[in-house]
Amino acid sequence: MFQVLVVEDDQELNRTVCAYLNQNGYQALGCLDANVAYDAMYGGTLFDLIISDIMMPGVDGFAFARTVRELNQEIPILFMTARDDFASKQRGFQAGIDDYMVKPIDLDELLLRMEALLRRARIASSKKLTTVTKPAIITI
């Protein structure tokens, strides 16, 4: 079962997204801000995907994404935000996110995007495992 971290300061949306993901075979944990999300990440759970808002109290989504990228280059990050301007999208992708959805979101579309991100992450991971070089045969 895939572990998903949902970082969204709107409590109702956070609960709705987590409930929907849990009903669809994911294990979702909701956090209301980035600091709580950091605690969850350091708490030992290995998350497979992060969904984050941009506009949150304290640490915003851009700073959160940059910090996550510094710690883990491979975990997919999807922004789910009300910001629909190009500058925000650009900043998000430059911070290291993998996808961007504008609120209000369609939960079925969110699921499709998550599945695509997880599929690409699995492919990238399997390529790393299969590109191990064959050791040379040494004759003595």
Question: What are the roles of these predicted feature ranges?
Answer:
Residues Q3, A116-I140:
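Short, Lys/Arg-enriched segments at the junction into DNA-binding effector domains
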Residues D10-L29:
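Two-component/phosphorelay signaling modules centered on CheY-like receiver
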Residues G30-L49:
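Acidic, metal-coordinating helix/loop segments flanking the phosphotransfer/catalytic sites
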Residues I51, M56:
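Receiver (REC) domain active-site loop signature in two-component systems and cognate sites
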Residues P57, D85, K103:
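The feature encodes the CheY-like receiver
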